[in-house]
From Swiss-Prot:
4'-phosphopantetheine is transferred from CoA to a specific serine of the apo-ACP-like protein. One of its GO terms (molecular function) is phosphopantetheine binding. It comes from the Bacteria. GO terms for biological process: antibiotic biosynthetic process; secondary metabolite biosynthetic process. SUPFAM superfamilies: ACP-like (SSF47336). SMART domains: PKS_PP (SM00823). PROSITE patterns: CARRIER (PS50075). The modification O-(pantetheine 4'-phosphoryl)serine is found at S43. Acyl carrier protein. Residues 8-83 form the Carrier domain. InterPro entries: ACP-like_sf, PKS_PP-bd, PP-bd_ACP. Pfam families: PP-binding. It comes from Streptomyces avermitilis (strain ATCC 31267 / DSM 46492 / JCM 5070 / NBRC 14893 / NCIMB 12804 / NRRL 8165 / MA-4680). This is Polyketide-8 synthase acyl carrier protein 2.
Length: 87
């Protein structure tokens, strides 16, 4: 899978990425489903999601930012912020 260099973020592609990592149907990954509570994500799966996000979107996620990766919406907002940051 080629590394994405565009700053455009498609929520449905993000949903597919998360569903793929978690081996779930895309429909199960709703915007507000809590990854740990609703989708049974453990720490290893959370790390795998983080690694895939960094590779796919070409961003580095600081440890403090990982608390935002609790739902698709939170992840989307974090990535939108990171991709819009031109520093």
């Amino acid at each position: 899978m080629p590394e994405t260099t565009t700053t455009a973020l498609d929520k449905e592609q993000l949903r597919e990425l998360v569903a793929d990592v978690l081996d779930l149907d895309v429909a199960e990954v709703t915007d507000d489903a809590d990854f740990m509570e609703d989708l049974d994500v453990d720490s290893l799966m959370a790390l795998e999601i983080t690694v895939r996000l960094e590779k796919e979107y070409g961003v580095r996620l600081a440890e403090a930012e990982l608390t935002s990766i609790t739902s698709l919406q939170g992840t989307y907002e974090l990535l939108t912020s990171k991709l819009g940051d031109t520093r």
